[in-house]
């Protein structure tokens, strides 16, 4: 598609797009700020080999809007934004590049706070931190929360229990058969919680070592990647690639609940409508996997793990609220999640509007 930038920004109510260029380091980046009604915009920095500049802009805009909804639904006083860097993260990175980006972020004076994302690391965030305080997910020695995977997993576990309560009348997962697609960092910690509660696990992953670890530690059964959709199970937990709920997989599903850590689980919105009509309880991805962003957001107030985990625990209540809206309004849960986020933003729109205050009033609480 041909991107008419201002027409697009107006249509979806974006506030700002910043183009960042540094000739010496080769930095080419886009910072997209979607909405700051709730507070400064928080969203990660992604580095990717985009096919075109237009594709990079579109990705930044799409991801920024997604962060607005994720942060709002999570109850955070933060808006949504995203940075994308055009380049190959395996060979194009340099200290100069990330320091240049840090200066651009500093120039926004706290309207935008970044974190790591696909293609970037904690080390990259540490370099950005040399130029600005408006970055989270840095090394623990700087007061960071460290690896977010265990906290994200705990949030998914809590959200899964809320979805199970709706589907089975109880949130007790003991004896429930749960098919976990992908056994990476987040899913491994999710499996720990599920195994501890007495759930029976079926796992798959293209990484055979990860599968073997789950088999040995949790007594899981292993299947091939293309077999996971059709297994007899109570809950399907997509924790790897996105778009796994689609025309090909839906007819195979035997689960009554879909709840996992993967992003963009529905290939298209209509797939959310289809599973809703089938009576499958779907825990919307950006609500159930918000533990990571809740965790890093806590760094802005001086990281307290107990406080962060308590907030992540409330993902149970958020999923329950989404299900309540779904039933009340007769809509699919993915629509209900959007409605929950939009209602929260709208309730504060008149009183707060665009965030233009000096960001140090938040970041200084570290």
Swiss-Prot record:
The active site is at 82. PROSITE patterns: GLFV_DEHYDROGENASE. NAD(+) binds at residues 182-188. It is an enzyme of class 1 (oxidoreductase). One of its GO terms (molecular function) is L-leucine dehydrogenase activity. InterPro entries: Aminoacid_DH-like_N_sf, Glu/Leu/Phe/Val/Trp_DH, Glu/Leu/Phe/Val/Trp_DH_C, Glu/Leu/Phe/Val/Trp_DH_dimer, Glu/Leu/Phe/Val_DH_AS, Glu/Phe/Leu/Val/Trp_DH_bac/arc, NAD(P)-bd_dom_sf. Pathway: Amino-acid degradation; L-leucine degradation; 4-methyl-2-oxopentanoate from L-leucine (dehydrogenase route): step 1/1. Belongs to the Glu/Leu/Phe/Val dehydrogenases family. This is Leucine dehydrogenase. It comes from Bacillus cereus (strain ATCC 14579 / DSM 31 / CCUG 7414 / JCM 2152 / NBRC 15305 / NCIMB 9373 / NCTC 2599 / NRRL B-3711).
């Amino acid at each position: 598609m041909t991107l008419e930038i201002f027409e697009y920004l107006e249509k979806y109510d974006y506030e700002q797009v910043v183009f960042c260029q540094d000739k010496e380091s080769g930095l080419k980046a886009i910072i997209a700020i979607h909405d700051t009604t709730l507070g400064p915009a928080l969203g990660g920095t992604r580095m990717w080999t985009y096919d075109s500049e237009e594709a990079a802009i579109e990705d930044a805009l799409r991801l920024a809007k997604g962060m607005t909804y994720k942060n709002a639904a999570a109850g955070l006083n933060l808006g949504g934004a995203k940075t994308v860097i055009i380049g190959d993260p395996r060979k194009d990175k340099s200290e100069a590049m990330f320091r240049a980006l840090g200066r651009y972020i500093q120039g926004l004076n706290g309207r935008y706070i970044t974190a790591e994302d696909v293609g970037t690391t904690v080390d990259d965030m540490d370099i950005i931190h040399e130029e600005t305080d408006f970055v989270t997910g840095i090394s623990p020695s700087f007061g960071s929360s460290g690896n977010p995977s265990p906290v994200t997993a705990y949030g998914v576990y809590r959200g899964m229990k809320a979805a199970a309560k709706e589907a089975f009348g109880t949130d007790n997962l003991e004896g429930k058969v749960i098919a976990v697609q992908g056994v990476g960092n987040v899913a491994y910690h999710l499996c720990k919680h599920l195994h501890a509660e007495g759930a029976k696990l079926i796992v798959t992953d293209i990484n055979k070592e990860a599968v073997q670890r789950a088999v040995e530690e949790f007594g899981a059964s292993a299947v091939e990647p293309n077999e996971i959709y059709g297994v007899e199970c109570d809950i399907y937990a997509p924790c790897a690639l996105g778009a796994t709920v689609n025309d090909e997989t839906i007819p195979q599903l035997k689960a009554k609940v879909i709840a996992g850590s993967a992003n963009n689980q529905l290939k298209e919105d209509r797939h959310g409508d289809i599973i809703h009509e089938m009576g499958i309880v779907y825990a919307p991805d950006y609500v159930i996997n918000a533990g990571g962003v809740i965790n890093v957001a806590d760094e802005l107030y001086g990281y307290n793990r107990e406080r962060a985990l308590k907030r992540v625990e409330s993902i149970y209540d958020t999923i329950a609220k989404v299900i309540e809206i779904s039933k009340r309004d007769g809509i699919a849960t993915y629509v209900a999640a959007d409605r929950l986020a939009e209602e929260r933003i709208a309730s504060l729109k008149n009183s707060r509007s665009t965030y233009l205050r000096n960001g140090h009033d938040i970041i200084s609480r570290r």
